[in-house]
Amino acid sequence: MRLHDELTREIVSRLQQINPQKIFLFGSYATGTASTDSDIDLLVIKEAISSRSKEMVEARKLLKGLGEAFDVLVATPEEYEFYRHEAGSVYREISERGMVIYAT
């Protein structure tokens, strides 16, 4: 199962309110193996992160009401660049199998 274009556009539209530089879709929706029980995994890359937990909560609030379950990670560009080379890190999985759905 893949993410519908209309839902992807709505996700991007809502998350633009937190000024992302890039948004990745990863996990089962990116690989085409999603089932009806799958959540939608997103990584939001943004320059200024005041509080990671607050940013993740804010992103989830923005996505509320779309009728899907979301798991949202937030990272700076520097964190993503550093950890995407680390074996076993979620950032490496994202760099290898994820899809960019928004970039400035």
Report the location of each language-model feature.
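Short hydrophobic/aromatic beta-strand micro-patches
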Residues: 43-45
